[in-house]
């Protein structure tokens, strides 16, 4: 039985320590601090987490935008850029057409040549790198790799030796050691020599650079012109006909891998080169050579500033020769020939012709029936006309000159007397018919039209100057064309110098022949040719002698006219008293015209042959006699009756 108060025993519980109660306020503060610290730690973690996420998101957005830009808007451009890094276009230069004379002799043609090239900075870097690696690898390897300096010296010596020391080794070496990215070591190199050099020295490059040849040197250079180093026309016909001569380059495009190997099947856009056409001229290189020689000799003998001469075919107006002194040589460096004549004065430099122009007055008077060759005019020593007094070149009283004699003796007064009969309007019309004040359109660059004042701009003195060849200007070609009209029975055929164009396939296209222009009747032309024989007529007594007997050619009838015109002094706008243009224009033979020759001398001190005076007639004689003999022109069957210049 149990006792009261007895209870079941439980395991013993550890005794709790006695708690010491603290004040309530202290406990509260401690609790709040702990909670605050926990809150701060939690907020910092959240901030860092969010910031990190935002940064990652921003990077992903930027990457996505860049990827989008690469794949969509810039994709085409990038593909094109990548393709261009692989794409290569090779150019095949067209061969420039030749320029030939009327007999197919070449005045200019092209031969294949090479230019030796080098990339100094790139090649030297490669040589230095190869040498360094060889040295590091050991002597056995370095024996197979050239020393960079020695290699460059070998290249320079090889090029100089094969090119006859032009350029020399020192010059080549200087280019090899330059800091340029690209240089030309030599130009105009024979392809075989260029190949030998590049085979031995792969560091040297070779590019095609065709060479223009001018076998005659300065022969006809004033007509043919020249080209620059890039093969483009620079002067003369080489320039004005550049599009015809140059042709069209060929090309082919292909892709090349990073290793430089052509990617198979990538060839495209293939265009074959079309070579330039050949241009045939009307000139005869033999005549051109002779005339050019004679012109230079006349310049040296006379002390003139310049001398020019033109030879035309009397019937067709074709230019057979056109020469001036001191002509440049297109086969040499044009840039070093500043003292040479680069232009073509025969078409580009007009001058006052002087008495050569009197043939217009004669033509107008004869054509209009206002005189005849044998009419005797009482010619005084001077004439007052248009407010000015004009005198003859020599003092004389009233002289009984025939119309023939007026022109044979070149009387200014007699010419103006006849011009008064013609009148200003008919005289001006005749000047225009003869082509003055108008370009001939011969086909040469830089042609001048000369100066012919319109009749409504004439001053009071114009009509006293123009009939005697002052107050207007013309080119030498225009002057010769006037006399071609008389030689061709009154029909002016505008001169031309381009005969035909020959395509690469051999197709010949003849240059269109200019249409003839009737200026005077055949009867007037024949009368003028007979009258103007008086100019070259000799007379031991001097009474019936003309002003240019030195122009005569034994056995042939020659018609022509001398000219002397005062030059203008730019300082005062007035005429010099002692500086002249000296001219001569003539027809050979006069009875059956074959050639028309025009000559201009600028301020000569002596005659063309060095004799006293200032006549161009001796130069005409030299050219005309050579032409007639060279082409076996038959002698004139009738030397013609003596002409009366002065009535007795």
From Swiss-Prot:
Molecular-function annotations in GO: penicillin binding
Transmembrane segments annotated in the record for this chain: 52-72
KW Manganese (keyword) present: no
Membrane topology, from the record: Single-pass membrane protein
InterPro entries: Bact_Transpept/Beta-Lactamase, Beta-lactam/transpept-like, PBP_dimer, PBP_dimer_sf, PCN-bd_Tpept
The entry's keywords: Cell membrane, Membrane, Transmembrane, Transmembrane helix
GO biological process: cell wall organization
Main location: membrane
SUPFAM superfamilies per record: beta-lactamase/transpeptidase-like (SSF56601), Penicillin binding protein dimerisation domain (SSF56519)
Active site: 355 (acyl-ester intermediate)
Record localization: Cell membrane
Similarity annotation: Belongs to the transpeptidase family.
Subunit annotation: Interacts with Wag31.
Identification of the protein by name: Penicillin-binding protein PbpB
Organism (species): Mycolicibacterium smegmatis (strain ATCC 700084 / mc(2)155)
Organismal lineage: Bacteria, Bacillati, Actinomycetota, Actinomycetes, Mycobacteriales
Gene: pbpB
């Amino acid at each position: 039985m149990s006792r009261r108060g007895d209870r079941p025993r439980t395991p013993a519980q550890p005794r709790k320590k006695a708690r010491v109660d603290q004040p309530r306020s202290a406990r509260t503060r401690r609790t709040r601090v702990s909670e605050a610290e926990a809150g701060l730690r939690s907020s910092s973690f959240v901030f860092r987490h969010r910031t990190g996420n935002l940064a990652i998101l921003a990077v992903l957005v930027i990457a996505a935008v860049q990827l989008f830009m690469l794949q969509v808007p810039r994709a085409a451009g990038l593909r094109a850029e990548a393709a261009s890094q692989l794409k290569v276009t090779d150019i095949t230069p067209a061969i420039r057409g030749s320029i030939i004379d009327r007999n197919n002799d070449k005045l200019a043609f092209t031969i294949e040549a090479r230019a030796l090239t080098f990339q100094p900075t790139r090649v030297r870097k490669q040589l230095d790198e190869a040498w360094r690696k060889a040295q590091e690898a050991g002597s056995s390897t370095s024996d197979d790799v050239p020393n960079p300096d020695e290699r460059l010296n070998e290249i320079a010596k090889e090029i100089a030796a094969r090119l006859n020391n032009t350029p020399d080794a020192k010059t080549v070496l200087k280019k090899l050691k330059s800091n340029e990215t690209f240089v030309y070591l030599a130009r105009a190199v024979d392809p075989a020599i260029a190949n030998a050099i590049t085979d031995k020295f792969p560091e040297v490059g070779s590019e095609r650079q065709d060479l223009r040849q001018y076998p005659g040197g300065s022969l006809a250079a004033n007509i043919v012109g020249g080209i620059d180093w890039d093969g483009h026309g620079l002067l003369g016909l080489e320039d004005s006909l550049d599009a015809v001569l140059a042709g069209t380059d060929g090309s082919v495009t292909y892709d090349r891998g990073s290793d430089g190997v052509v990617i198979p099947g990538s060839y495209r856009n293939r265009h074959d080169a079309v070579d330039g056409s050949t241009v045939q001229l009307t000139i005869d290189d033999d005549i051109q050579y002779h005339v050019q020689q004679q012109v230079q000799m006349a310049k040296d003998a006379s002390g003139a500033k310049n001398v020019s001469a033109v030879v035309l075919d009397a019937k067709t107006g074709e230019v057979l020769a056109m020469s001036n002194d001191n002509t440049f040589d297109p086969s040499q460096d044009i840039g070093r020939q500043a003292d040479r004549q680069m232009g073509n004065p025969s078409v580009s430099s007009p001058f006052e012709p002087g008495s050569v122009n009197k043939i217009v007055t004669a033509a107008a008077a004869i054509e209009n029936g206002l005189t005849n060759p044998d009419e005797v005019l009482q010619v005084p020593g001077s004439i007052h006309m248009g407010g000015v007094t004009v005198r003859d070149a020599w003092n004389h009283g009233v002289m009984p000159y025939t119309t023939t004699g007026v022109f044979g003796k070149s009387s200014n007064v007699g010419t103006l007397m006849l011009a008064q009969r013609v009148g200003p309007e008919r005289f001006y019309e005749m000047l225009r018919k003869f082509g003055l004040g108008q370009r001939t359109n011969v086909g040469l660059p830089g042609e001048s039209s000369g100066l012919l004042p319109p009749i409504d701009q004439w001053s009071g003195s114009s009509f006293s100057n123009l009939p005697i060849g002052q107050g207007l200007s013309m080119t030498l070609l225009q002057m010769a064309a006037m006399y071609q009209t008389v030689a061709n029975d009154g029909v002016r055929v505008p001169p031309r110098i381009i005969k035909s164009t020959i395509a690469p396939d051999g197709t010949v296209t003849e240059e269109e022949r200019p249409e003839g222009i009737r200026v005077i009747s055949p009867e007037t032309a024949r009368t003028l040719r007979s009258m103007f024989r008086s100019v070259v007529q000799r007379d031991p007594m001097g009474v019936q002698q003309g002003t240019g007997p030195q122009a005569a050619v034994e056995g042939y009838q020659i018609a022509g006219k001398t000219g002397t015109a005062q030059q203008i002094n730019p300082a005062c706008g007035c005429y010099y008293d002692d500086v002249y243009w000296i001219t001569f224009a003539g027809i050979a033979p006069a009875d059956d015209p074959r050639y028309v020759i025009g000559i201009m001398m600028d301020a000569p001190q002596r005659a063309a042959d060095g004799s006293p005076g200032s006549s161009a007639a001796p130069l005409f004689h030299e050219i005309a006699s050579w032409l007639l003999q060279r082409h076996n022109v038959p002698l004139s069957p009738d030397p013609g009756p003596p002409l009366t210049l002065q009535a007795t």
